[in-house]
UniProtKB/Swiss-Prot annotation:
GO cellular component: cytosol
Keyword Chloroplast applies: no
Example of a GO MF term: uridine phosphorylase activity
Gene3D superfamilies, per database record: Jelly Rolls (2.60.120.10)
Function: Catalyzes the phosphorolysis of diverse nucleosides, yielding D-ribose 1-phosphate and the respective free bases. Can use uridine, adenosine, guanosine, cytidine, thymidine, inosine and xanthosine as substrates. Also catalyzes the reverse reactions.
Broad class of enzyme this protein falls into: transferase
UniProtKB keywords: Glycosyltransferase, Transferase
Classification via CDD domains: cupin_PpnP-like (cd20296)
Gene field: ppnP
InterPro entries: Ppnp, RmlC-like_jellyroll, RmlC_Cupin_sf
Catalytic activity: a purine D-ribonucleoside + phosphate = a purine nucleobase + alpha-D-ribose 1-phosphate; adenosine + phosphate = alpha-D-ribose 1-phosphate + adenine; cytidine + phosphate = cytosine + alpha-D-ribose 1-phosphate; guanosine + phosphate = alpha-D-ribose 1-phosphate + guanine
Name of the featured protein: Pyrimidine/purine nucleoside phosphorylase
Organism: Burkholderia multivorans (strain ATCC 17616 / 249)
């Protein structure tokens, strides 16, 4: 079904998800089992996101710092690393190098 570099047998929603005046743009990928992911890019900036469901952000390229809701600690992430974000929470992200990511909704 999937490999390290691609997703097979999926549908893609054509309309982009554009947030923060175009600083974050993603596309929704729908899987046959009903799950969904977004594939996106965040340009260098500082943003605050809210979540409904728990999320797993897999960094494909770029570099960022993240501070989860309730924490005072910033954690740096780069290509090949994942960020786990609880549901019904917020997080701050500072994108240092344009971030290419895959977000799974758990």
């Amino acid at each position: 079904m999937t490999s390290a570099t691609q997703f097979d047998n999926v549908s893609v929603v054509k309309r982009a998800n554009v947030y923060f005046d175009g600083k974050c743009v993603s596309h929704t990928v729908l899987f046959p089992d009903g799950t969904r992911k977004t594939l996106g890019v965040i340009l260098p900036c500082a943003l605050n996101f809210g979540t409904d469901a728990p999320e797993l952000m897999e960094v494909q390229a770029g570099k960022c710092r993240v501070k989860l809701d309730g924490s005072d600690t910033w954690q740096t992430y780069g290509a090949g690393e994942s960020i786990s974000v609880p549901g019904k929470s917020r997080f701050d992200i500072e994108v240092i190098e344009t971030l290419d990511y895959v977000c799974s909704y758990l």
